[in-house]
């Protein structure tokens, strides 16, 4: 939701001053990492926005990614299950990505009427998996499984689902 983006952005900005926090681990609640933004709650209202308001939303989502990248603590994404849309972006913006074989990561923006380069994907994803592979994922919205994500260099390690937080 819009509020979730703002809350996460603000959290990562505050972490710059949190000397007592040594690392950040992002994990989903339940069987999935993050399925992305609610299409009806986010995409629907975006259609009715005028350019200045749309730019404000784009800046807010971009500011979340920037806040993550400027966070002085290492950010680890512990990915199990679905990791899509904004969830895939948050995993991409993390310093390390630990996944499971059953993970499915997808950049689905073009499938819901948004640009495939949303939230900095065109900048960061090619640096992780290479230009050709990034283009494939961003153009098609195809999901990659955990083993393929490891082969492509997207995941730093593939773990058993029950130990992804332990690793």
Spans of model-derived segments:
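Terminal peptide-recognition signature
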Residues: 7-8, 26, 38, 74, ...
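Catalytic-core regions built around general acid/base machinery
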Residues: 11, 60-71
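Loop-to-helix element that buttresses phosphate recognition and phosphoryl-transfer chemistry
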Residues: 32-33
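Short, flexible, mixed-charge acidic loops at enzyme active sites
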Residues: 36-45
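Crotonase-fold acyl-CoA enzyme core
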Residues: 66-167
């Amino acid at each position: 939701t819009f509020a979730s983006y703002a809350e996460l952005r603000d959290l990562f900005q505050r972490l710059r001053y949190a000397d007592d926090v040594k690392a950040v681990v992002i994990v989903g609640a339940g069987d999935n990492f993050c399925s992305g933004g609610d299409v009806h709650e986010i995409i629907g209202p975006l259609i009715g926005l005028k350019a200045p308001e749309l730019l404000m939303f784009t800046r807010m989502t971009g500011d979340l990614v920037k806040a993550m990248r400027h966070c002085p603590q290492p950010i680890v994404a512990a990915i199990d299950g679905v990791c899509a849309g904004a969830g895939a972006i948050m995993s991409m913006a993390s310093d390390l990505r630990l996944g499971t074989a059953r993970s499915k990561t997808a950049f689905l923006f073009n499938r819901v009427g948004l640009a495939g380069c949303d939230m900095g994907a065109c900048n960061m994803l090619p640096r992780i998996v290479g230009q050709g592979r990034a283009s494939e994922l961003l153009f098609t919205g195809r999901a990659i499984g955990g083993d393929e994500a490891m082969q492509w260099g997207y995941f730093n390690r593939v773990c058993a689902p029950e130990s992804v937080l332990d690793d």
